[in-house]
């Protein structure tokens, strides 16, 4: 199935209304080139960012992306750097989406957000199980090389992951959104990448020592072994996705 511009425009307005009902104050919309709109357009514009103010101090940025017959809503708290992602299917586009949980996640502090994220991963990912690493390594590579995944790294959204793992941290197209993270900024939007990943993003490239356990470009540590390339960093795992 596919969506037309009118359907997406209606969903755009419904998301905006949900934000207003949650107490957000609309500020403006901005294009990637810096142009500003003071109202929500009635037609869908994928390159548009929506800016809101919540609790008189927290700035929220939203963006809608249509990819692979799903609509993704990406949110970033510019104040706390907390992030959230949700998606809509065919049936959900007919009604006003419930963004309560989405907004609550954006309003958590950076420390709380990371703690919740780590708790979720610890409950799903047995990092001490090296057999699991090898199994995941094989399945994730097979998943990545399926023909339905796009070649463009900025359009990469890993929604069909092994073991039913969430896709929220898996290589969201942050640069295409206009969010250009620097070192230490927006890591909730930007997946871990190694040093010198060779210019070709294939989801599991590693830097120096690739094939010998890998190398985490952020934490500067090697891996468990020759196959997994993991060193126990909770976020390094997502480099495999």
UniProtKB/Swiss-Prot annotation:
Give GO BP annotations, semicolon-separated: ubiquitin-dependent protein catabolic process
Keyword terms of this UniProt record: Cytoplasm, Nucleus
CC annotations in GO: cytosol; nucleus
Keyword Nucleus on entry: yes
- Localization of this protein: Cytoplasm; Nucleus
- Identification of the protein by name: Uncharacterized protein P4G3.03
Question: Where does this protein come from, organism-wise?
Answer: Schizosaccharomyces pombe (strain 972 / ATCC 24843) (Fission yeast)
Native organism taxonomy: Eukaryota, Fungi, Dikarya, Ascomycota, Taphrinomycotina
């Amino acid at each position: 199935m596919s969506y037309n511009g009118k359907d997406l425009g209606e969903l755009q307005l419904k998301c905006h209304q949900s934000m207003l009902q949650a107490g957000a104050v609309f500020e403006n919309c901005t294009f990637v080139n810096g142009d500003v709109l003071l109202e929500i357009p009635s037609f869908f514009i994928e390159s548009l960012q929506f800016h809101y103010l919540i609790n008189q101090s927290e700035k929220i940025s939203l963006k809608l992306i249509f990819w692979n017959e799903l609509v993704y809503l990406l949110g970033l708290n510019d104040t706390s750097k907390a992030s959230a992602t949700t998606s809509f299917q065919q049936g959900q586009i007919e009604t006003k989406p419930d963004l309560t949980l989405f907004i609550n996640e954006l309003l958590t502090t950076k420390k709380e957000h990371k703690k919740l994220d780590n708790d979720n991963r610890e409950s799903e990912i047995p990092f001490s199980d090296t057999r699991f690493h090898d199994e995941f390594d094989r399945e994730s590579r097979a998943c990545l090389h399926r023909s339905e995944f796009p070649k463009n790294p900025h359009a990469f959204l890993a929604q069909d992951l092994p073991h039913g793992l969430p896709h929220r941290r898996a290589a969201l197209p942050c640069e295409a959104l206009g969010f250009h993270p620097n070192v230490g900024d927006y890591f909730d939007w930007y997946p871990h990448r190694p040093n010198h990943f060779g210019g070709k993003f294939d989801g599991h490239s590693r830097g120096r020592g690739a094939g010998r356990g890998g190398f985490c470009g952020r934490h500067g540590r090697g891996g468990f072994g020759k196959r997994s390339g993991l060193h126990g960093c909770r976020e390094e795992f997502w480099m495999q996705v």
